[in-house]
Amino acid sequence: MPNSIFKKQLSPIKPGDPIDYKDVELLKKFITERGKILPRRMTGLTSKQQRDLTLAVKRARIVALLPFVNPEG
């Protein structure tokens, strides 16, 4: 697909690096302006990293480090 809608990014997370729910600046790179978690095809993460990222974002939302939705977006 030469005219793909999704452009793959180079992941800022190296394989083996932990994804921490307290690292809000890193997590913000993987959510949209509306607060949705970006899919793996856009983030360029491995499947394990994507699962860890999803868990970290959900934990950060529970402890109010990230919003569940962003009404300004």
Swiss-Prot record:
Role according to the record: Binds as a heterodimer with protein bS6 to the central domain of the 16S rRNA, where it helps stabilize the platform of the 30S subunit.
Superkingdom assignment: Bacteria
Coiled coil: none
Assembly information from the UniProt record: Part of the 30S ribosomal subunit. Forms a tight heterodimer with protein bS6.
GO molecular function: small ribosomal subunit rRNA binding; structural constituent of ribosome
Signal sequence range: none
Protein name, per record: Small ribosomal subunit protein bS18
Gene: rpsR
GO cellular component, one term: cytosolic small ribosomal subunit
PANTHER family in alphabetical order: 30S RIBOSOMAL PROTEIN S18, SMALL RIBOSOMAL SUBUNIT PROTEIN BS18M
